[in-house]
Each structure stands twice: as C-alpha cells, then as structure tokens.
Amino acid sequence: MKSKKPRSLLGIEGMESKEINALLKLAARMEPTRRRNTLRGKTVVLLFYENSTRTRSSFELAAKVLGATTILITATASSIEKGESLIDTGYTVRALGADAIVMRHPSSGAHWLLAEHLDIPIINAGDGMHEHPSQGLLDALTILQAKKKFKGLKIAIVGDIYHSRVARSNVHLLPKLGAKVVLCGPPDLCPDEMAKIASGIEVSHNLDHALSGADVVMSLRVQKERLVGRQIGVEDYIANYQITPEKLALAKKDAVLMHPGPIIRGMELTSEVADGHASKILAQVHNGVKVRMAILQTLLAKN
C-alpha cells in the first residue's frame, strides 16, 4: 500500500491473520441494535454497479447504526448509465463530500483502480469473480461463533467455485487462520486450478469425499449469469452436488451449514437443509451487519 493513502479494504489476499483477527474481535463486540455516534458527520457512499440485497442493505444499516449518513448510487439511476467512467464517478462522489465508498463492480480489480485515484477509503463489496472480503469475514465470524476456533477444522465449500468471489475470499482467509478447505463441484465449475489460489487447498469432484468429516459445509449457488461458454446439466448437478439431509449426514454430527445467498432452493440445497437445525444462514445475515460495522469503524474512525 502506497504511503499517504488511506486504509482500504480491497481484498483478503493481502491481509495478515493479525488484521483479520482484529476485525473479527471488534465485530464480535458490535451490537446492531445499539446506535452510536462513532461516525457522526461522516458520509458513506454506496456505489453499486451490480444488484445486491444483503450486502448493500447491511452496509447501509451498519453505517447508520454508527451515526454516518449514507448515499446510494446505482448504475441504472446515475450518469454511469450515460457512459461516465469509474474514475470520473469517483471524483464526483469525492467532490460531493464522501468520506468512504463502498463499491460493487462487475470488473475484477476495479476497487484497486479507484483506490489509486482517491484519497478516501474504498471498501470492496464484490468485484467480478475476484473477491468479496466482507462476506469472507462474516463467514469467518459465523464459523468462530459456532466452533470457537479455526485450527484443525475441515471446511467444505460446494458449488460454483469458479465464478464465486465468495469462495475466493474464503480460500484466502480460512487457511490463514488454520482451517483446511476442500473445494467441491463439477469440473467445469470447480477446475483443479482452483487449488492454486492459496496453499493447502484441496479440490474434489466427489461430494461424499468433500463432506466426509466436515465441520462446516458452505453451499454456493450456480451463477447462471456468469456461465459464459460453460455448460451445466441441472439434473446432473442436483444428482451429484445438491446438499440434502442424507448428504449433510456425511459431515460431523455437529457440523454447521452455511450459504452466502441468494439461495436457490431445490438446486444447490434442499429446504430441509436450509431450514434445518445445522443451518447458520440467518446468523450469517446478522453477522454481516456486525462485520461491516467493524470495517467502517476501523477505516473511518481513524481517517
């Protein structure tokens, strides 16, 4: 990171375990129902080039709970639709008084470009197929709450790994904290090359193997909107990779089930699993606000 530049959250890959643990510790103390004035007078701009429900709303709530003002800018309701460049949009937002920008963008690396040109924190809310750092952090917090540790855990991530920025952030994050990660899916959606993203990653195309003895099972949806040049047989996918109660039983008895959303019931998992006793899906949503409060406070309270 260049000198004189404010701290930003651009990805998990470049973070050290010390930084990750500090954010998780702070997030665990955050209470979304208790409003405070930590960021009073600050303005957080939510710049979303792609649709979002959980991420956008939880960042907005997190900022408001901390006392900040939020402004939402979407691609379809701004000059972006007229062809304005990312950098010019960033300059405009900064001139309006933004103290931080939370951005989701379809292009990998867009946040790094914006951070090079602006003197305010940039927070990555998802960039293409690259990373989704706040999701990785909230997943880690959810696992920590359920398991009290990371070291020695087997975490199976099942589904469309190739197109998933969530998977990439988790692959960078979880091994740093001592967990073993197994990626599982059909070859087109989980190619062997995914094991090269980080050290200690295993790739398997056999669901039974991936789930056997797992402490955490993370299901991912098939991102049909990104399936360019790749084919998937829905019936074959369901038969071989859908998480059912029977498949989940291959994991440890106290295993937890996670999903970043949106869920496609009947595709990557069944309703019995999504709504079952092992499910931590709603806990993930709740922890999203806590983690994003911690991110905003860490980056803005000191800038």
From Swiss-Prot:
HAMAP family: Asp_carb_tr
Name used for this protein in its record: Aspartate carbamoyltransferase catalytic subunit
Species name: Koribacter versatilis (strain Ellin345)
Disulfide links within the chain: none
Pathway terms, separated by semicolons: Pyrimidine metabolism; UMP biosynthesis via de novo pathway; (S)-dihydroorotate from bicarbonate: step 2/3
Enzymatic class: transferase
Gene: pyrB
Keywords assigned by UniProt, alphabetized: Pyrimidine biosynthesis, Transferase
Classification via InterPro entries: Asp/Orn_carbamoyltranf_P-bd, Asp/Orn_carbamoylTrfase, Asp/Orn_carbamoylTrfase_sf, Asp_carbamoyltransf, Asp_carbamoyltransf_Asp/Orn-bd
NCBIfam families to which the protein is assigned, alphabetical: asp_carb_tr (TIGR00670), PRK00856.1 (NF002032)
Biological role stated in the UniProt entry: Catalyzes the condensation of carbamoyl phosphate and aspartate to form carbamoyl aspartate and inorganic phosphate, the committed step in the de novo pyrimidine nucleotide biosynthesis pathway.
